Amino acid sequence: MICSIMGGLRSLRAARPYSHQSNTETKHMGLVGVASLLVLVADCTIFASGLSSSTRSRESQTLSASTSGNPFQANVEMKTFMERFNLTHHHQSGIYVDLGQDKEVDGTLYREPAGLCPIWGKHIELQQPDRPPYRNNFLEDVPTEKEYKQSGNPLPGGFNLNFVTPSGQRISPFPMELLEKNSNIKASTDLGRCAEFAFKTVAMDKNNKATKYRYPFVYDSKKRLCHILYVSMQLMEGKKYCSVKGEPPDLTWYCFKPRKSVTENHHLIYGSAYVGENPDAFISKCPNQALRGYRFGVWKKGRCLDYTELTDTVIERVESKAQCWVKTFENDGVASDQPHTYPLTSQASWNDWWPLHQSDQPHSGGVGRNYGFYYVDTTGEGKCALSDQVPDCLVSDSAAVSYTAAGSLSEETPNFIIPSNPSVTPPTPETALQCTADKFPDSFGACDVQACKRQKTSCVGGQIQSTSVDCTADEQNECGSNTALIAGLAVGGVLLLALLGGGCYFAKRLDRNKGVQAAHHEHEFQSDRGARKKRPSDLMQEAEPSFWDEAEENIEQDGETHVMVEGDY
């Protein structure tokens, strides 16, 4: 479909490192993709979003299942608040690796990032050599042909698109000060403006016709810069296919992988261009911040079971809340669209940039072990409970912090996120849970006759408090004889850990996938993913062969690669 561009068009060319070069030389000095004519065009209002029902999961995990009597679902305000944590419904794509959609370019299907929520703190860690000209920064420009010839293998540079306008203004990174002033950008937040800018940028095919393929973005909230990434790949591992710090030698690609860090890059936010399709939606639809003072839980048997009570939960020891946040993103069960197998030709030439669709490549739809919380156990040790169960209720714990794989480490709303209406204060985890006793009376769940407990949910100090209390006298007659040994665990409005008593919970927990007893997962936090068992999909995909000019024959060398932008940027 050809996009009808409205407004002034600007012809752009690939970035040049030297302004004095001749026209002939600059044709070879631009982005190596010059020959491919895969370029960008500003999207116009009639341009379809390209969200394909065949490639994007539309089926969300239902929050209302087994929620009879759940006060977090009965109250409209609370139900709306809890639904934002349903990443299957609101994000609809991979998180660790997001390649959730397929788009056709020149008769071939390619995969693109497609998630609808920003991924806070996500960055790509490069394993280039620790020597010039390598900088191990994925936000560096993609390499020019000249830069590659000077460095040799592995490739230098990073993933950033390096096109410029005739006036010399770079397309990426683009200053937020300019996006704020631009009438084409309607978003109300800095992050939304960057996402919208990415959504208005699409690839062109070899005939200079607009496609529907869009590129991911990274917003740097510290520098207020919007990066458009020309490389959609997010993970490449294995010494047969890529090198780590130059070993093994002579491989075209260096290895790289998505990361979140305990101490660094919290100001970077990775997202697909589709966050910008409705650039203000993420403010209320996505779990952008961590939730302080509560454990995620699932409503069953008339009470809220936090993740430590679910049989398929993974529990690991951590030294800090930040490590639990990292684990929520990097654990082996998190939603990922990474393909299952490596192509045999991945090192045949230096041309792997766009992910190529293959039949064995998964579309996770956002389903995965995307949820977790930090808590302190009865011995005083910090623990991280990880689950694939979408939370539909909360258990009070003043020492706990609940995380999602998409959200930030921050327990407050970042100051650069502003509401659509400036007169309205942006919601925080605290204000979102406010209640009044007259409108939120005490409610009780059904009696769990095994534990002889029922859940009491009430409004205390303007906050929802969920605690476990004894069943009524009549209900206690139906409880087992050992009730006294496992009851009475609610202290000061905080539900303690050992609701099932002792260590029997972990002794009985089974690994859902293998059907055998599961380990307690009490090992120390490991920052090196290579020391752990990789998920089956931790493999690369074949990518666009036409990025490098040598991959195509009979490439037209007349004229430059063009970028068309609606209006002035």
Curated annotation (Swiss-Prot):
Glycosylation sites noted in the Swiss-Prot or TrEMBL record: 86
GO cellular component, as recorded: extracellular region; plasma membrane
Organism: Toxoplasma gondii (strain ATCC 50861 / VEG)
Protein's recorded name: Apical membrane antigen 1
Free-text description of this protein's post-translational modifications in UniProt: Proteolytically cleaved during invasion within its transmembrane domain, releasing a soluble form from the tachyzoite surface. The cytosolic tail generated by ROM4 cleavage during invasion may trigger parasite replication within the parasitophorous vacuole.
Residue numbers spanned by region DI: 67-287
Summary of the knockout phenotype: Severely compromises the parasite in its ability to invade host cells. Inhibits secretion of the rhoptries, organelles whose discharge is coupled to active host cell penetration.
Effect of residue 489 to G: Enhances cleavage 13-fold
Position of the signal peptide: 1-48
